């Protein structure tokens, strides 16, 4: 029964009871290691169970089923307890023949009962338990006064227990109340989660990328991204990819596969986007127009370069002579003057030129062509 306080109820912070902002899954995961259903089950004594009305018993069923589903979702290896089977079938979880909960062996008192068992100052004891277990939740009317902690510290009074049941019935709906929007929360998990959202605190941080989350559950979902990250590796070059489809496209580089073919010229491409760009050439489409001079361009990058002419910008400067150019290609051509490089060679006579246009004009000598005629 001692596991109940750690598995179900919110826990105190280091400086007292500041909202008790960690829920059962978060606390158990970080503080206690692997979680079991025993850690998250709520157990009642026979008297406590009979004290609950139909709505409260329904609430109990929902909370227990949700706790079990959370364990399964987190991938924790847990066998299905008899209590869960019983709750799923809508049966009463209290075994009247054995006088115990279905999931647990017979006990004299549950941990919950021991904590709430009264001494003559019944209200004081109950308020102290509420403050200890629920961190006050912003309710200033719950004053902390001196009272007993458990059944071992005071004499058990039967008439006091009946008084406790009445007080519990009138007070329980206020325990899980959000002090910001005055919403009443009946689920043990949701009260902490809702309050954390108001504070904006994100205590759960991803060690891989540093991103923070307000819920452990959200952190778990986020980690799937990193698990998948670069999990698909190319056997040829060792390059890794996040998605299998990206790896498939990459492999075409090694295989030489060019499955995207242009119907007009028959040219093949690795990717559909490359084929789309190629089609523009055949169509003669010019989508990008200069607002200054009206000149059209097939690609936006070409228009961007062209605009530098109108702007008068010359960002590309020659280190040799300080001359500036509006386009990088112009600077590249200019540098040949300083280097003395002549990459364009005539196959007929071996003469070299630093400009391709100069080579083209030179070739006319060998062909005997005379394109320029006097009118």
From Swiss-Prot:
Top-level taxon: Eukaryota
Subcellular location: Nucleus
Boundaries of every KRAB domain copy: 35-106
Cellular component terms (Gene Ontology): nucleus
Keywords from the UniProt entry: DNA-binding, Metal-binding, Nucleus, Repeat, Transcription, Transcription regulation, Zinc, Zinc-finger
Zn-finger segments (C2H2-type): 176-198, 204-226, 232-254, 260-282, 288-310, 316-338, 344-366
GO molecular function, one term: DNA binding
CDD domains the record matches: KRAB_A-box
UniProt KW Iron-sulfur keyword: no
One BP term from GO: regulation of DNA-templated transcription
SUPFAM superfamilies: beta-beta-alpha zinc fingers, KRAB domain (Kruppel-associated box)
SMART domains membership: KRAB (SM00349), ZnF_C2H2 (SM00355)
Function of the protein: May be involved in transcriptional regulation.
Name of this protein: Zinc finger protein 738
Organism annotation: Homo sapiens (Human)
